[in-house]
A protein has these predicted regions:
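Beta-propeller blade termini and top-face loops
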Residues: 1-258
Length: 258
């Protein structure tokens, strides 16, 4: 009963729920039109995690728009796939709020990348590409080039022609899978920073090549333990990054490193 979109007007002291679908559906992605802060897009995702597994997708999933700062919402459907949907990722072009992209999980006949040139009133599918969305699924528009589109799911890819064709650069060789966040420098679009299950990677050539940043204390450990050696070793199992062990002491001033 606590799922949905919430709004605060006092810096987070109090919150009001402004969009609610049902107890099985929450908000998974949300963007604001940079040229009109009263225009908001919210992607709702029907998903439930249980002790024995999870269910994802259903008739609760959908894309909504508000033009009055969240007071009222309208579901956007024209041109989008009918029936049950799953994860939806959205982005608005910062230089023209009419241009919106949505990465939609649906059945084989409807999934893919959709484009709107009228603030979401109607949509057309420009690509069937949707790299296994899961709970992470992102689409990002280059803030200085509306034809440059990035997609992140399990895999990562980019397009220079508005989604007609795609390339990966050295992403397959040098990026960890499962991409959650992407930042594009608005002053230099060649500089992009990507967050994935493997940590943080950056590129200075528009995602053609990538550098991974090691030794950041951001790994998600599910369990840790110690062995019986002297000095004892500390071991941990990470999210999609294997298990690591290291001595609990080191003779370097930098501490224990990967």
């Amino acid at each position: 009963e606590e799922r949905g979109v919430y709004k605060t007007v006092d810096g987070g002291a109090k919150w009001e729920r402004v969009l609610y679908i049902d107890e099985h559906t929450g908000a998974i992605d949300m963007v604001m039109d940079p040229s009109d802060p009263n225009t908001l897009f919210a992607a709702m995702y029907q998903r439930e995690r249980k002790s024995f597994g999870f269910s994802a997708g259903g008739d609760g999933s959908g894309l909504y728009r508000s033009t009055d700062g969240g007071a009222t919402w309208t579901e956007l459907t024209e041109g989008l796939p009918a029936g049950d949907k799953g994860r939806i990722g959205i982005d608005v072009y910062r230089r023209d709020g009419n241009l919106v992209y949505a990465l939609v999980e649906s059945d084989q006949s409807g999934r893919g990348l959709y484009k709107s040139t009228n603030r979401g009133e109607s949509w057309e599918r420009v690509s069937t590409r949707n790299p296994r969305p899961m709970y992470f699924s992102l689409v990002r528009i280059d803030p200085n080039n509306p034809e440059r589109i990035y997609l992140g799911g399990v895999a990562f890819s980019a397009s220079d022609d508005g989604g007609k064709t795609w390339w990966q650069g050295d992403a397959a060789a040098n990026l960890h899978v499962d991409h959650h966040a992407l930042w594009i420098d608005p002053n230099n679009s060649d500089y992009v920073v990507l967050g994935s299950d493997g940590g943080i990677s950056s590129s200075w050539d528009g995602a053609q090549t990538w550098r991974h940043h090691n030794n950041l204390a951001i790994g998600q450990f599910y369990e840790i333990g110690v062995d019986m050696s002297e000095p004892y070793k500390v071991c941990g199992g990470l999210q999609d990054n294997s298990s690591w062990c290291a001595p609990n002491e080191t003779n370097t001033p930098y501490g224990v490193k990967n």
